[in-house]
Structures are given as structure tokens and as C-alpha cells.
Design a protein with these regions (language model features):
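Juxtamembrane and boundary regions of transmembrane helices in multi-pass small-molecule transporters
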Residues: 81, 88, 100-101, 120-163
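Alpha-helical transmembrane segments of multipass membrane proteins
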Residues: 50-54, 75, 139, 175-183
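Membrane-embedded alpha-helical segments and adjacent helix-loop junctions characteristic
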Residues: 2-84
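Helix-loop-helix module between adjacent transmembrane segments
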Residues: 14-19, 39, 50-61, 92-101, ...
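Transmembrane helix boundary and interhelical junction motifs in multipass membrane proteins
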Residues: 61-68, 72, 102-108, 188-190
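Short, amphipathic, aromatic/basic-enriched membrane-interface segments that mark the entry/exit
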Residues: 32-41, 156-167, 182-186
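Hydrophobic mid-bilayer segments of alpha-helices in multi-pass membrane transport proteins
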Residues: 1-16, 67, 167-178, 186-194
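Hydrophobic alpha-helical transmembrane segments
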Residues: 8-9, 42-50, 64, 87-88, ...
Length: 194
């Protein structure tokens, strides 16, 4: 079969979820939170790598890159930092983190649908390699860009972005329901779409 309907439905469901999270301002709020709590350029890179990897494990990595790239550019511009280390961190961490679950990237979705491996078992096998990959990404970027990442404090400009709380609650319930369904062994594709 050239086209696997279950994989396409799973991809569609995860992208719809990411679209609603975007409408709720989840990604903007996350970016602001990361900037507030990272304090330094190196701390920002660490936070960006870990957040990108974590989000990419549960949302499709391509979607995470698309949603976070404009926010990363906005953050580094407001903090007067070079964009390259952070953009590389975003894309590399998204790829590394996405290997942890079936929902992280389309290739894993195909594996998940075709293999019938339980979601929790796949995570048990792949979480450590994903985490180690994220640490390697961080170490390589810190080494490559040691001169471009100054030792100074950074602060966000302006108040936190407004969040659609009602939609955020709905999205949180949807994410929790999807994860429960995945771990319960229900079909990945239809769990994500419902």
C-alpha cells in the first residue's frame, strides 16, 4: 500500500491539536516563560533545546519547528542575540526529541501503526536515546557557539502574551485524553483525531 490511511489520520490529528494550541497562544506563552526563566543566553539555549525536544516528542516535530521559529526569532532579536545557535538548536532538538514517541515524526507514525508496538513500550525503548541525543545537541552547540553566547543576563520585554484560557483548558484536556488513549493501547490514529 502506497498510502497508509491510519498514519495520515494520526498526522492530521496531531497537526490539528498543534493548530489549536497555537490559537490558544500556548507556543507564545511557552516562549515567554522560557525567556523569563532562562536568565542567560546559554540558559536560553538549554531551555530551547529541552522544550523543543519535549514538545517534538508529543507533537509532530515539523509542527513544533513551524510554530516556534518565529517566536525564537522574536526572542533572540529582543535579547540582542545571534539567531543561528537558537535556530539550529530548535531544528536539531526537534529531530532528536521526536524519536522518543510514535507521534514525534511521520516515520515513527508509520512504524507505530505498522508494528503494533504499544506506545508505552516504544517510549521505554526510545526515551533514553532521545534524551542523550538532546544532550549531544546542546553540547555541540555550546562548543560551536561559545564565543557568540555572551555571559550576561537577559530579560523579556513587555508583559506575558495573552492566552485564551478557555481554549487552553480544552487543549489540555484533549492532550491528556490523547496521551491516556495512547498509553492504554487504543488505535493511535483515531485517538489523535477524536
Amino acid at each position: 500500500r502506497a498510502v497508509d490511511v491510519d498514519t495520515l489520520v494520526l498526522l492530521l490529528g496531531m497537526m490539528l491539536l498543534a493548530a489549536y494550541l497555537t490559537r490558544a497562544a500556548f507556543f507564545r506563552a511557552t516562549a515567554y516563560y522560557v525567556l523569563v526563566h532562562s536568565k542567560t543566553p546559554r540558559g536560553l539555549l538549554l531551555a530551547l533545546v529541552m522544550i523543543s525536544g519535549l514538545l517534538s516528542a508529543f507533537l509532530v516535530n515539523d509542527t513544533v519547528c513551524l510554530m516556534l521559529t518565529p517566536l525564537v526569532l522574536m526572542l533572540v532579536k529582543s535579547a540582542d542575540l545571534p539567531p543561528l545557535p537558537y535556530l539550529l538548536g530548535l531544528c536539531m532538538a526537534s529531530n532528536a526529541g521526536s524519536v522518543a514517541t510514535f507521534t514525534g515524526n511521520p516515520q515513527n507514525m508509520i512504524i507505530g501503526v505498522a508494528s503494533k508496538i504499544p506506545y508505552a513500550q516504544f517510549i521505554a525503548y526510545m526515551a533514553l536515546p532521545a534524551l542523550l541525543s538532546l544532550l549531544v545537541v546542546l553540547a555541540v552547540l555550546l562548543f560551536m557557539f561559545s564565543k557568540e553566547l555572551p555571559h550576561r543576563s537577559i530579560h523579556p520585554e513587555g508583559p506575558p502574551p495573552p492566552v485564551d484560557r478557555r481554549l487552553m483548558v480544552i487543549c489540555s484536556i484533549a492532550v491528556a485524553g490523547i496521551l491516556v488513549a495512547f498509553f492504554a493501547g487504543l488505535p493511535l490514529s483515531w485517538s489523535a483525531l477524536v
